């Protein structure tokens, strides 16, 4: 086996890329997309409320 200086870095990138791909596939294949979108909407609204409260204090 040939060892290169970048082999550890590239293998880490490949592993994380595979994890991200599997996660996205799970979201799209198993209907998690709607739940995820609902979560993002709720989280966005919560952050907007926090921003409004912080701006009101100034």
UniProtKB/Swiss-Prot annotation:
- UniProt entry keywords in alphabetical sequence: Membrane, Mitochondrion, Mitochondrion inner membrane, Tricarboxylic acid cycle
Pathway in which this enzyme or protein is active: Carbohydrate metabolism; tricarboxylic acid cycle
Q: Name one GO cellular component term.
A: mitochondrial inner membrane
Biological process according to GO: tricarboxylic acid cycle
Compartment(s) where it occurs, according to its Swiss-Prot or TrEMBL record: Mitochondrion inner membrane
Q: Which domain of life is it from?
A: Eukaryota
For the keyword Mitochondrion, the answer is: yes
UniProt topology in membrane:
Peripheral membrane protein
Q: How does it assemble?
A: Component of complex II composed of eight subunits in plants: four classical SDH subunits SDH1, SDH2, SDH3 and SDH4 (a flavoprotein (FP), an iron-sulfur protein (IP), and a cytochrome b composed of a large and a small subunit.), as well as four subunits unknown in mitochondria from bacteria and heterotrophic eukaryotes.
Protein name listed in UniProt: Succinate dehydrogenase subunit 8A, mitochondrial
Q: Which organism is it from?
A: Oryza sativa subsp. japonica
The gene name on file is: SDH8A
